[in-house]
Every structure is written in structure tokens, then in C-alpha cells.
Amino acid sequence: MALPLSDPNAPEFTRRYVNLADPRLGAQALEASDDFFAPKERMLNPEPAVFIPGKYDDHGKWMDGWETRRKRTTGYDWCVVKLARPGVIKGVDIDTSHFTGNFPPAASIEAAHVPDGAPNEATKWVEIVPATTLQGNSHHYVEARDANAYTHLRVNLYPDGGIARLRVYGQPQLDWAGASRSALFDLAAMENGGYVVAANNQHFGLASNVLLPGRGVNMGDGWETRRRREPGNDWAIVALAQPGVIRKVEIDTAHFKGNYPDRCSIQAAYVQGGTDSSLVTQAMFWPVLLGEQKLQMDKQHAFEAELAALGPVTHVRLNIIPDGGVSRLRVWGTLDK
């Protein structure tokens, strides 16, 4: 099944930053004032929301999101979300897909920094998204302008209703300054701040999946391109979380058996200046970090001695030759001094 097209109107922060509310990275919906019609956890599902006509449960129409009962008192509904990592929030997407007569007229988002435990009555909340008018069956992209790092959010619905998905895009905050300069870090890991700048094709699976933690759960939990019918090869460019010297690379083709790439190679560079989009052309000429290597189906491949000594780099380009699917990419390196 081909992937649905991404929203062409989505702002840059949805592509540039990590979804800190992704449960695959560790985010959790902790508590809610009410989730009678649809559980709060469903709001964080990384898959796009769906609508299933005729599907009902004991509480009524099944909806793919978080939905509260009709409020017959004063006040408003809320849900507390623990982010996957502490981070500086750059923007959110409050998605009401398929909620038409049951979406909230407005919503706001507050944030708190609670490094130990969960928020309580003494927690100080800071509004990062003011009360925003919502429409049914729509994405609502709101930029956040707070430079502080937060660990938890409180989503407020005025007064009640349902939202399909909550995406919270931000920069994970790690103590890189205090980190060891001799330890190995997965500099491409999404939870560390690595992200996919661009990929030439993502027909069957998003390139960003290769940066997720753990091994892929199935073939859909990886990056897969369409069958190439012309010369050339497919590729994805990854911005590393921090500049570093690459010591080891792992390429995992888990679950890809009749559709894994025949070969792969990696280029890398230390990029200063320019924009993400300007890297696409430049990356063709980057130095080779890993020359062409044969791949096997459903296997973790590790490369160390094969890596060229390029010094510190900020970006890598994974080439899969000619096409196919990769489950995970790990780029282990030491931090640039």
C-alpha cells in the first residue's frame, strides 16, 4: 500500500523537528479529565487517523483519537502528555481529522518542566499555544515561540470534544556539552535529534523510520522505495544530532527479504551554512564514508574497518542500490571536540 501524500501546506517545523509526542520514542498520555468515547492514548498514534463507517463500541461511535463526553457542567477537558524526551517545542499540529460534529471549538496547550515524576497540583504550567479556534476534519499547525525545554504538556479542550492526533515538534535537549568525548553515540537516532533532510522516494515507507529506536516490527516499519525502472539509485540524507567522527555504521534490513537493496554506500560531509533543501544537490558530491557493500535480506550489517577517515561530519547520505527497503540506520560516532 502506497503512503498517503503528506500535507503540502504543512510548515517547515513538521519536517525539520522530531515529534516529541511519538509513543515509539517513549511519549505517554498520562491522565485526562475524561476519555469516555475514545481513549487518550489513541491521540498519540503515529499513524494517520482513519474513519471506519459503521464501527461502534460500548460507548458509541468508534473514533480514531481522544474524545470526551458532552460536558454538562462548567469547565473544560484536558489531557497531560509526557514527552518522549525533554525538548524545546517549535510547533504543534492539532489534528481533528474525521471529527466533524464532535470537535472542540477551541484548544490550548500548556507546558511544564518536571524532570522527576509526574506533574501535580504544585506544578507550574506555562502556556505555549494560546486558545486557538479549531475546525472539523482539519490540521491546525501552530508555531511555538518559547525557548525553554519542557517535559510535559497539558492539552486543553474548550469545552469538550475530540481530536484525532497531537503532534509536538521540537528539538530534544541532551547535555551534549557535558557528554564524554570518547563515548559512542548514535548520532542519527531520532530521539537524539537526528532527522531526515530529504529522500528521493518514500513510496512504501517513510525514510524517517530508519532513525526510530529498536528493530523494525515489520516491513512497514522501515523505509521502502518503489521499484526503480530507470538508471540510478535511491537515497536519503540524514542530519546528525551533533557533529561527530563516525566510528561504526549499522544497516538493518529486518523483514525485507524479496525487496532489500542489492548494495549500499554512504557519503558524508561537514556542512556549514545553506538550507536543508540546498543540500540535495551538494550531497551528490560528498566524500565517500562507506564504499559500496553487498547487503543481505533480513539482517543487521555492521561496518567499522570499511569506513573512511573523514574527520567530523554533520550529515550523511545513505545510498541504496538500486532500490528497495531498509529498516534501520545507526551512525555511531564520537562527538567533535
UniProtKB/Swiss-Prot annotation:
Keywords assigned: Hydrolase, Purine metabolism
Bilayer-spanning residue ranges: none
Keyword Iron: no
EC number: 3.5.3.4
This protein's pathway: Nitrogen metabolism; (S)-allantoin degradation; (S)-ureidoglycolate from allantoate (aminidohydrolase route): step 1/1
The keyword Hydrolase appears for this protein: yes
Gene Ontology biological process terms in this record: allantoin catabolic process; purine nucleobase metabolic process
GO MF terms, alphabetically ordered: allantoicase activity
Domain of life, per lineage: Bacteria
A Pfam family the protein falls into: Allantoicase
Gene3D superfamilies per the UniProt record, alphabetical: Galactose-binding domain-like
Catalytic activity: allantoate + H2O = (S)-ureidoglycolate + urea
Family listed: Belongs to the allantoicase family.
Record PANTHER family: ALLANTOICASE (PTHR12045), INACTIVE ALLANTOICASE-RELATED (PTHR12045:SF3)
Protein name, per record: Probable allantoicase 1
